[in-house]
A protein has these predicted regions:
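Structural core segment of the AMP-binding/adenylate-forming
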Residues: 1, 75, 102-169
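Flexible, non-catalytic linker and terminal segments flanking ANL/adenylate-forming cores
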Residues: 1-29
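A short, compositionally biased
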Residues: 2, 40-45
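Short low-complexity stretches enriched in small and charged residues
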Residues: 2-9, 85-88, 107-113
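Ligand-binding pocket scaffold of soluble enzyme catalytic domains
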Residues: 13, 28, 38, 101, ...
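Conserved AMP-binding/adenylate-forming core of the ANL superfamily
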Residues: 26-28, 33, 37, 45-90, ...
Length: 169
C-alpha cells in the first residue's frame, strides 16, 4: 500500500478537532537531557521523581544523571553505543536512561520479566557492553553474562530509593 493511501496520510482524526486547534504544532528540537538541564535550572528544588514516598528534586536528578553519565564514559561507552537497562520503573531506571542519552549512547530498555534466552538475544543483538540492573538479579546476570557481549554490570538496589523504614527491607 502506498503511503498516500494510508490512514496516516489521510489523517481522519483531524475532523474531530475543535475549531482553532492546529493540525500540527511547532516545537523546539531539543534533547531530553537538555530539557532536564533547563528544568533543573528553573525549578531546582521541585520534585522530579517520586518512588514509594522517596522524592528526588530536579537538582538531585541532574546531579545523579551527570555522575552516572561520567561513570558510563569511564566504562568506555561511546556515542552511538548501546547500554542495556534491565530495571523496573523506579528512580535508577530514569537516571540510567537520561545518563545514557546524555553521552549520546543508545538505551536498550529490557523487561525484568524477560527469560534468559530473550535477554541474551537483546544484549547480543544490541551489542550492549554495559548492563544496568537490580542487585536482586545479580546471580542471574552473572550466569548470563558469558553468553553475551556485556563486559560491565552496574547494580542498583530498590532499597536505596525507599524512605525509612522501608529502606531497611
Amino acid at each position: 500500500m502506498a503511503y498516500e493511501d494510508s490512514i496516516y496520510f489521510k489523517k481522519p482524526w483531524l475532523k474531530s478537532y475543535e475549531p482553532g486547534v492546529p493540525a500540527a504544532i511547532d516545537y523546539e528540537e531539543i534533547a531530553m537531557p537538555d530539557i532536564l538541564d533547563r528544568t533543573a535550572a528553573k525549578w531546582p528544588d521541585k520534585a522530579a521523581l517520586i518512588f514509594q514516598g522517596y522524592s528526588v528534586t530536579y537538582r538531585q536528578m541532574k546531579d545523579m544523571v551527570d555522575r552516572f553519565a561520567a561513570c558510563l564514559t569511564d566504562f568506555g561507552v561511546k556515542q552511538g553505543e548501546a547500554v542495556a537497562i534491565l530495571l523496573p520503573n523506579m528512580i535508577p531506571q530514569v537516571i540510567a536512561y537520561y545518563a545514557t542519552l546524555r553521552i549520546g549512547a543508545v538505551t536498550v530498555l529490557n523487561n525484568p520479566l524477560y527469560s534468559d534466552r530473550e535477554l541474551e538475544h537483546q544484549f547480543n543483538d544490541s551489542g550492549s557492553k554495559v548492563l544496568v540492573t537490580l542487585d536482586l538479579l545479580g546471580n542471574r546476570m552473572i550466569d548470563l553474562r558469558p553468553r553475551t557481549k556485556v563486559k560491565q554490570i552496574v547494580y542498583t538496589s530498590i532499597g536505596d530509593y525507599l524512605p525509612f523504614p522501608k529502606s531497611l527491607l
